[in-house]
Amino acid sequence: MGVLLREALRSMCVNNQWSYAVFWKIGCQNSSLLIWEECYNETESSSNPRRLCGLGVDTQGNEKVQLLTNRMMLNNRIILVGEGLVGRAAFTGHHQWILANSFNRDVHPPEVINEMLLQFSAGIQTVAVFPVVPHGVVQLGSSLPIMENLGFVNDVKGLILQLGCVPGALLSENYRTYEPAADFIGVPVSRIIPSQGHKILQSSAFVAETSKQHFNSTGSSDHQMVEESPCNLVDEHEGGWQSTTGFLTAGEVAVPSNPDAWLNQNFSCMSNVDAAEQQQIPCEDISSKRSLGSDDLFDMLGLDDKNKGCDNSWGVSQMRTEVLTRELSDFRIIQEMDPEFGSSGYELSGTDHLLDAVVSGACSSTKQISDETSESCKTTLTKVSNSSVTTPSHSSPQGSQLFEKKHGQPLGPSSVYGSQISSWVEQAHSLKREGSPRMVNKNETAKPANNRKRLKPGENPRPRPKDRQMIQDRVKELREIIPNGAKCSIDALLERTIKHMLFLQNVSKHSDKLKQTGESKIMKEDGGGATWAFEVGSKSMVCPIVVEDINPPRIFQVEMLCEQRGFFLEIADWIRSLGLTILKGVIETRVDKIWARFTVEASRDVTRMEIFMQLVNILEQTMKCGGNSKTILDGIKATMPLPVTGGCSM
């Protein structure tokens, strides 16, 4: 397919005074790379001495252009997007048009300046770079100053975009695969791609007329001979012919692989034309004589030769046989690499029925076909059907599936035959993965034995998991250790466990301080020492609240009389509400009275009088209100303690 790209570059140079044309292709694997794909320079078009003399081509300038393109290819065969003139154009998406007489070095980076100096030293006066997303970049150079033409820029981009619709058209000849080049030998790019009316396409030896004819995306056409732009000179034929206005000649662009057979087959009506005496033959005469026979296989399958773009010239049967031969050889290589591919359990039953239908239709058809053409078609399809290509019968029940349309464009002969093997291979692999019968284990198909033992009432058929059993055992142990945790829920049990652990942590923390606590001084002295009257005029002269200092600092001993109310736990809550930590709490009986004694620790510097006044306030409100202790505590917390710096003798 590289002939199409090369023909497009040649058309740009020859008809628009460009000295060279280069197509940089965006890398398929890495889009940040631009790869030198194809190049054309005017040295190739001026190899004929007669043409050099007639056109006045400067051979020395052509040699400089040739050396320039060779140096460009050797130095920068692969460039990064964003580097250099071509890379910057691909990155920005804007074309660049640089003239030697107006080149400004201040607006370009050093790498671009070096490139332009190299171009100018080779005699190039104009350099143009056109990015064509997503295919690549076109670079043009001319030894003449050419003014910027936006119409030409758009036409070049449109030409490359249309070439991109042809599979493999933007690949050079070095990267061609099994696609036969004979399908496009002698066919200029204007026959493959619709004309845009610009000079770039009108310059081809074969110019496609802007008519209702549609060309397919695979690059094959029906090769209808069309008119060319006016030309008064008839040059010598180099494997082709030149034409005058309204009459046909074959182009000088590309020479078929077998020129003699091609000319005898398609232009036998011109065998008597003398080279010195050119005859003008209308297009319709030649197109009526050039065909040796129609392709009845395509006719029977509903594809018209003229409308679908199938080619009948150049020995269609032979070329298609070569295509299928290459496809089948590729398939055999795949089959050798994957032995399971040919034995996946599917046969070509659908294709065999298709072949029978085609052959029977050919016998009953009203068209007369040559034995040679039908035999070649039958042999070709027989080779395909007898191969071990795996496809289900429902995948191709009718022949119309062989000629599906892509994007609304009919498929040409190369894609019809060339891509069918690939589609069969893909279908077979997908069906092998999805639709092939799954190997079922015998143990899966066997019915489970009905030998379960009947369980007794209350038995659990499945044992409890080991981790769950261990959790249940630990919860049971916690219920035995934590006070009042026998009948609470698991979350309440965990909460009690946390509180119990904090309590034990405080006990271990203050264990040394508990050893230093002493007894009450009131009980040691006769008469009880100084006391505080709870109520004036009461019979009891014993103070119900006593607060003493105990070494070390911030350790106090609080004693409260709780005989009448029995508020031991409430007293403990009151003490905690004052921000004190209870280190020890006991209930003692003294002279027929019950006392609650607490050893507490303060977290800040407080006096015993401050603690005493708070406890008196709490006790007074309790006796007066006789209400809930929690409500009383909430009210006490709202009152700030009075700072007392002096001591109180007990």
From Swiss-Prot:
What keyword terms does UniProt attach to this protein? Activator, Developmental protein, DNA-binding, Nucleus, Transcription, Transcription regulation
Question: What sequence ranges are listed for the domain bHLH?
Answer: 455-504
Could you say which tissues express the protein in this record?
Answer: Expressed in both root and shoot meristems. Present in root tips.
Task: Quote the PROSITE patterns the UniProt record gives.
Answer: BHLH
Cellular component per GO, a single term: nucleus
Effect of loss of the gene: Loss of bilateral symmetry and reduced number of cells in the center of the root, resulting in roots with only single xylem and phloem poles and defect in lateral root formation.
TM region(s), chain numbering: none
Q: Which domain of life is it from?
A: Eukaryota
Extract the ranges annotated as region (Disordered).
381-417, 431-470
Localization recorded for this chain is: Nucleus
Q: Which GO terms describe its molecular function?
A: DNA binding; DNA-binding transcription factor activity; protein homodimerization activity
Q: Where is this motif: Nuclear localization signal?
A: 451-458
Q: Name the GO terms of the biological process aspect.
A: maintenance of root meristem identity; positive regulation of DNA-templated transcription; regulation of DNA-templated transcription; root development; stele development; xylem development
Where does the record place Low complexity bias?
Answer: 384-397
| Compositionally biased residues, Basic and acidic residues | 456-470
Q: How does it assemble?
A: Homodimer. Can also interact with bHLH proteins.
Please give the family membership noted in the entry.
Answer: Belongs to the bHLH protein family. LHW subfamily.
Task: Quote the function comment for this protein.
Answer: Transcription activator that regulates root development; promotes the production of stele cells in roots. Coordinately controls the number of all vascular cell types by regulating the size of the pool of cells from which they arise.
Q: What is this protein called?
A: Transcription factor LHW
Q: What is the lineage of its organism?
A: Eukaryota, Viridiplantae, Streptophyta, Embryophyta, Tracheophyta
* Gene name in the database record: LHW
